[in-house]
Amino acid sequence: MRLTVIAIGKLKQGPERELAERYRGRFDDLGRKLGFRGLDIHEIAESRARDAAGRMAEEAAAIAALIAEGSSLVTLDERGKSVDSAAFAAQLGRWRDESVPGTIFVIGGADGLLPELRRKAKLCLSFGAATWPHQMVRVMLLEQIYRAATILAGHPYHRA
């Protein structure tokens, strides 16, 4: 199963990008041993539409173009479900074991995600009630993906 992160906005050079790349690399190394076929990141430019509805619609169209048929869609949204790391790992493991071709994680723009896109998701995740900068959400997601791989591998990184 291939994992993909689709994010509205680009990470500029700096500590957030370095940390994101570190977790991505760690996952790639361990994930291949667990039957995952890598982790892709697609950055989509923020819409320049005048209103929030227009921006969300343009961004949703760009996101939809990257969603492969048969993939499990996971959206990140403040209204989503908060799951612990073990449950997150178990879900990724189930999708892998069910031969789902891919799991696609979507991080929306400043206005959030179009409700229709959120409804299509098999899972809508939240990293709590706080509002997080998009750069941090990407780093936190990549860390959780890496942590999930360590849990599935029985690696001591996760000590819960």
From Swiss-Prot:
Coarse class of the protein's main subcellular location: cytoplasm
EC id: 2.1.1.177
Group of enzyme by EC: transferase
Record's keyword annotation contains Cytoplasm: yes
Protein's organism: Rhodopseudomonas palustris (strain BisB5)
Subunit: Homodimer.
Keywords: Cytoplasm, Methyltransferase, rRNA processing, S-adenosyl-L-methionine, Transferase
The UniProt record lists the keyword Transcription: no
GO molecular function: rRNA (pseudouridine-N3-)-methyltransferase activity
GO cellular component terms attached to this protein's record: cytoplasm
Subcellular location: Cytoplasm
NCBIfam families (alphabetical): PRK00103.2-3, PRK00103.2-5
Reaction catalysed by this enzyme: pseudouridine(1915) in 23S rRNA + S-adenosyl-L-methionine = N(3)-methylpseudouridine(1915) in 23S rRNA + S-adenosyl-L-homocysteine + H(+)
Residues where S-adenosyl-L-methionine binds: 76, 108
PANTHER family: METHYLTRANSFERASE, RIBOSOMAL RNA LARGE SUBUNIT METHYLTRANSFERASE H
Gene3D superfamilies listed in its UniProt record: 3.40.1280.10
UniProt family annotation: Belongs to the RNA methyltransferase RlmH family.
Function: Specifically methylates the pseudouridine at position 1915 (m3Psi1915) in 23S rRNA.
Name listed for the protein in its UniProt record: Ribosomal RNA large subunit methyltransferase H
Highest taxon, organism lineage: Bacteria
